[in-house]
Amino acid sequence: DKISRVEADITDRDARVVDVSGRFVFPGFIDAHTHFDLAVAGTVTADDFETGTRAAVSGGTTTIVDFATQYRGETLKEALDNWHKKADQKSSCNYGFHLAISEFPESISRELEEVIRDGVTSFKLYMIYDDNMLDDGSIYRVLKRLTELGGIAGVHCENSDLVKAMVQEQKELGNLTTSAHPASRPPLVEAEAVDRLLKIAALADSPIIVVHLSTKAGLKEVQSAREQGQEVYLETCPQYLLLDDSVYDLPDFEGGKYIIAPPLRKKEDQEALWEALADNSIQTISTDHCSFTLKQKAAGKEDFTKIPGGMAGVETRPVLMYTCGVETGRITMEQMCRLLSENPAKLYGMYPQKGVIAPGSDADLVVWNPEAKWVLSAENQTANVDYQTYEGYPVKGIAEQVYVNGQLAAENGKVVKEHLGQYVKRKPYPKLS
């Protein structure tokens, strides 16, 4: 299950030889932001670890990092145990967990040391959602503690009070359709929270990750902090690069498919994010895969705030980034490799076990056929969803062969061997440990 040699000419009579002429070979892609088997808005995501990891591997993703949520009153160990029960023996790609911390009493602070020692080295903090969010003082204390221990946090940045006020404003105006969604969470709601987080992180002298960045305004805050010497990492998602907020005005509740938080933005935000990818200002592209069926989405037909927020993406990320990034010249093939594999491996304590093709690294490999042409549709997807948010989208390139821990797991979008995934224990954040 490891790569034994990387050489120009290897002669081994017992080895099976795979001809990959005219193909690219990538280290297995890593999606460091998925939500499988997650309870949201009175329902549970359509994809659990069984179906979600099948979807991942079918598109070329060999490792996912999901979120184990510590609900208030639980220990961190209880949260991790809950998520291991959801994932163990069911995963067709490798998996790890970020720990989402919902409160920060002294007992949780003490427990962090053991958790990090056991290989969970990244954490999720929310600045929004009443059941999960931490106040600013708690965020400061968590960041200081993580910096002591070699952990790092990714943060969902939206101003909770402003979102509540703006949602209420839309309701008072009688705007209950999906068209009101972007107005209820405008770009400055993200930018303010990003700015506040960066100041908290500066006070804590802590590195920080802003997850699912969606706005030009938020990007500017990060660029400004970096100019002051602050250590900030950025993640964005394909939907913020390829879709815009005009979809919320589509008729017949089509807009419901695209209700996510933060919302889809304007074309100018897309452009700013693409430029930031090109100049390496953004480190990773993940998906925030959080899928729901049309029936689940329909819970909010009369009130957009009741639509479960999230969309699928774990399966389509590689082909969308190849088609819309590499083929268009917006990013290079090497940048795609860094954004989808090497950088998340480094940031989340998996490098050089993953994220590189080198002797001793895990044999997670993707053989990429750059010439394949096909069309995305609900019919040809593996994810457990009855629609495709990129329906009819012509794409180029395909994960022709996907190897997980040295075994062929998928070919041309079809899973050929299930349940090859192993749990990944990760190292502390490198600059601190």
Predicted regions: what is each one?
Residues 1, 22, 33, 56, ...:
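Divalent metal-coordination and catalytic microenvironments
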Residues 1-27:
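Histidine-rich, glycine-flanked metal-binding segment
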Residues 23, 42-96, 102-121, 138-148, ...:
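Alpha-helical scaffold segments that flank or form the walls of functional sites
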Residues 28-41, 153-158, 287:
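Histidine-centered catalytic micro-motifs
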Residues 31-34, 61-66, 92, 171-182:
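Gly-rich Lys/Arg/Thr-decorated short loops/hinges at beta-loop-alpha junctions or inter-strand turns
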Residues 107-285:
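Histidine/acidic residue-rich metal-binding segments in metalloenzymes
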Residues 178-207, 257-258, 283-285, 291-372:
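His/Asp/Glu-enriched, well-ordered alpha-helical/loop segment
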Residues 299-303, 359-425:
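C-terminal cap of metal-dependent C-N hydrolases
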